[in-house]
Amino acid sequence: MVEDHKHEESILEKIVEKIHGHGDSSSLSDSDDDKKSTSSSSSSFKSKIYRLFGREKPVHKVLGGGKPADIFLWRNKKVSGGVLGAVTASWVLFELFEYHLLAFLCHFAIFALAALFLWSNACTFIHKSTPHIPEVHIPEDPILQLVSGLRIEINRGLTLLRNIASGKDVKKFILVIAGLWVLSIIGSCYNFLTLFYTATVLLFTIPVLYEKYEDKVDAYGEKAMREIKKQYAVLDEKVLRKVISKIPRGALNKKKD
C-alpha cells in the first residue's frame, strides 16, 4: 500500500510539473510574441517618421561621409575650429581690411622666399646645416576625384534645367525661378567673398545643430510642408490651371511630342 501511494504521488508530481512547464513555455512564447509585436510596431513607427526633404540616410552620410563630413559635424573640434578660424581670418583680411588676394599672395611669397634665402645663407656662415625644404607635389587622384564629382553634379544640374525648360513640371519651374530670384537679390547686396564666407559658416553650424535637434526640426518641417502643399494646391486651382487652360491644345500637344 505504501509503495502504491508513493507511486501515485510521483505520477501526480510529474503531471503538475508538466502543467507548470507548459504554462511557463506558453508564457515565454507569449512574451516573445509581445516583444516581436512591439519591435515590429516600433520599427513601423520609425519608418513612418517624417524626415526633412525625404532624407533616409544619417546627416553624416548626406554630407558625403569621411573626413569632410567629420569636419562639418565637429567630430574633431580642433580641426573644425582651425578650418573655420582660417576662413574667418581670410574674410576679415580681404573684406574688412580690403586686402586684395593677388597682393596678399605676392607679399606672402616674397616674405617666405626672403626668410628661407637669408636663413640658408646664414647657416653657411655659422657652420650649421641648411634648413630642409620639403618637396611639395599635388597628388593626381584627389584632383581627378574632385573634378569627376563636379562634372557629375554639373551634368545633373543641366539635366534638371533642361527638364524644367521643357515645360513638363510647373512646380519645379516655380521653385527654381523663385530660388534664382532670391539669389539675385542676395548677390546684389553682397559680394562673392562674403557669400562664400556666409555659406561656409552655415555649413559649419546648420548640419551640427540639425543633427542635435533632429526630431524637433523634422516635426516643424512636416508642419511647414503640409502648409506649403495646401498653399500650392490653392495656387494650382486658382491660377495655374486657368493659365494652362488658356493655352491652345495644339501648343501643348507639340510640347508633349
Curated annotation (Swiss-Prot):
A GO biological-process term: response to bacterium
Region (Disordered): 19-42
InterPro entries named among the record's database cross-references: Reticulon, Reticulon-like
Protein localization: Endoplasmic reticulum membrane
Signal sequence coordinates: none
Entry annotated with the keyword Membrane: yes
Pfam families, sorted: Reticulon
Segments crossing the lipid bilayer: 78-98, 99-119, 173-193
Keyword set, alphabetical order: Endoplasmic reticulum, Membrane, Transmembrane, Transmembrane helix
Location of the Reticulon domain: 68-257
Membrane topology of the entry: Multi-pass membrane protein
A cellular-component GO term for this protein: cytoplasmic side of endoplasmic reticulum membrane
Residues forming coiled coils: none
Role: Plays a role in the Agrobacterium-mediated plant transformation via its interaction with VirB2, the major component of the T-pilus.
Quaternary context: Interacts with VirB2.
Protein name per Swiss-Prot or TrEMBL: Reticulon-like protein B4
Organism from which the protein derives: Arabidopsis thaliana (Mouse-ear cress)
Source taxonomy: Eukaryota, Viridiplantae, Streptophyta, Embryophyta, Tracheophyta
Gene: RTNLB4
